[in-house]
C-alpha cells in the first residue's frame, strides 16, 4: 500500500490493543495506590472548580480539553510518521494503541511523587495530589476521542478547534496545555502570579 493509502484508524485488533494498553495503565495506577475514584466518595461527570480537592478526581474537568488536544497532536505525529515517512515496520492500525501507550505513560508519570511535587512547587496547582484512576482513565479516553476526531476531520477544523480549546481554557481558568507545559518545564513567576489572579 502506498503512503497515501495508509489508514491511521484502528481496526478491531488495533482497538482491542488500545483498550488493553489503557486497562494496563489503570491496573498500574491502582498498584501505585492511586484512589480509584474521588476520595470524597462522589462520582461526577464534570467538575469545574480548579482550586478544589475534586479537581482531577472526576470524569472530566477543565483539563479534559488538554487531553483532547493531546489526541489531535498524537494523530498529527502519527500522520507524519506513517504518511510522510512511510513507517513500514509497524502497521498503521496500531497508531491509536501507540498514542494510548504514550498518554498512559504520561498518566503514570504525572501521578508519581516527582511530578506531583513539581506541580505543587511551580504551578498554580498548589494543593495537587495527583489524579484519581477514574480521572486518568477518562483522560486517556479524551485523548483517544481527540485522536479519532482528528483522523476523520479536515486538518483545518482540527487546528482551529485545538486553538479554540486553548483560548477558551485560557479565558476560563487562566491555564491551558501550552501554559501547563511551560510552567512544568520552565516556570515563569509572572505567569504563576497572573494565573493566581494577581
From Swiss-Prot:
TM helices/strands, residue ranges: 13-33, 62-82, 96-116, 153-173, 177-197
Family of this protein: Belongs to the UPF0314 family.
Compartments reported by the entry: Cell membrane
HAMAP family, sorted: UPF0314
Membrane topology recorded in Swiss-Prot or TrEMBL: Multi-pass membrane protein
Keyword Transmembrane set for record: yes
Major localization class: membrane
Organism: Novosphingobium aromaticivorans (strain ATCC 700278 / DSM 12444 / CCUG 56034 / CIP 105152 / NBRC 16084 / F199)
InterPro entries linked: DUF2585
The protein's name in its UniProt record: UPF0314 protein Saro_1818
The organism's taxonomic lineage, starting at the top: Bacteria, Pseudomonadati, Pseudomonadota, Alphaproteobacteria, Sphingomonadales
One Pfam family, short name: DUF2585
Record carries keyword Membrane: yes
Keywords, sorted A to Z: Cell membrane, Membrane, Transmembrane, Transmembrane helix
Gene Ontology cellular-component terms listed: plasma membrane
